[in-house]
Amino acid sequence: MATSAAFLKGDFKRTGKMELSDEQKSQMWINSVNSENKEALLAWVKETGIELVQINGQRKYGGPPPGWIGNAPVSGSEVFIGKIPQDIYEDKLIPLFQSVGKLYEFRLMMTFSGLNRGFAYARYISRRQAISAIMSLNGFEITKGCCIVVCRSTEKSELALDGLPGNFDENMLKNVLDEVTSGVSSISLHPSPTKESQVLAVVKYDSHRAAAMAKKTLCEGSPILPGLPLTVNWLKTDMRQKLRSTDKLQQTKDLSPLPLLYTDRPDLPKETLLSAVGCLNMLCQEMKLGRPVFLIKLFSVTSFGWIRFWYQVVIPTYPTPFCGYAWMIGENLELNEKYEHARQVVAMKILSALGYIPDFSLGDVTARNAL
């Protein structure tokens, strides 16, 4: 051992005590916490040959277990175990939960000191065995006076991505996510409840593991759009309910008649109808606001082909200018086409802010500009 070697070499301070690094002191303290049960765990691991792997604050058995052939068990086969005494380890827990069914995976959440965090997850090979574990072990007295809680695991698989640009659609986001994550099964977009003119995406993955890996990737170094303050969290029940309420309110607004739709006006040229800038110019002319003046500053292209840009639009007799940041796809456009497409994106945002929504999509504008 390093400590013994240092002692034999006479590595002392003048006080006669051996000099230990902060890391060695920390390790000695960790080893001293619950040492008796830790030694029992080590003996059990050696005796059974079971393999436990420490990964990101949890210690895991299986997933899959030795000899497993085939796909992982279906959703609903995992149980949550709560109110575990913090000094109890897998040598007590795994045999207990194996007594009611075959375990595919067992995960015990751990603290830095080596104590458990009071909860774990056990995944069985079938839903029936998970139900059996709940019926048999919920309320089980694992130590004197300590009864554990066993219930169905929610197996979270949905992420909330808040702060996306307002011109994102599901296909754009899926293409980006497929580059950095795997297992996306569905995407829905909603107005952000916290960030004006931006979008919150609910992304459902095909498993909890895929969602957890995606969350880790998106939070730790693979941002969807560099420079964009994107927030990534598990989708919570209160947020789901809030989004549903917002969507219902938006549907009601969508049914209300709009004050003006330029596509209903046969006297306007088709080119004007398909141009957000043209529609904005016509609106400002009819309202006697003056012709809008656009100022656009382009930034670098991201690895996904997105361009971030700053804009300011001054409408002569409108009280305040419109300004901010926006995103667009334009990697393969010429410089003048990039500026024109940025103008179209901004014009759409301003028309929406003024309450006038032309009956065309930016997809039409993109296609026309790309020709």
From Swiss-Prot:
UniProt xrefs under Pfam families: DND1_DSRM, RRM_1
MF term (GO), any: mRNA 3'-UTR binding
GO biological-process terms attached to the record: germ cell development; mRNA stabilization; negative regulation of miRNA-mediated gene silencing
Keywords: Cytoplasm, Developmental protein, Nucleus, Repeat, RNA-binding
Matches recorded under SUPFAM superfamilies: RNA-binding domain, RBD
Superkingdom per UniProt: Eukaryota
Nucleus as UniProt keyword: yes
Stated role: RNA-binding factor that positively regulates gene expression by prohibiting miRNA-mediated gene suppression. Relieves miRNA repression in germline cells. Prohibits the function of several miRNAs by blocking the accessibility of target mRNAs. Sequence-specific RNA-binding factor that binds to U-rich regions (URRs) in the 3'untranslated region (3'-UTR) of several mRNAs. Does not bind to miRNAs. May play a role during early embryonic survival.
Protein name in UniProt: Dead end protein homolog 1
Gene that encodes it: dnd1
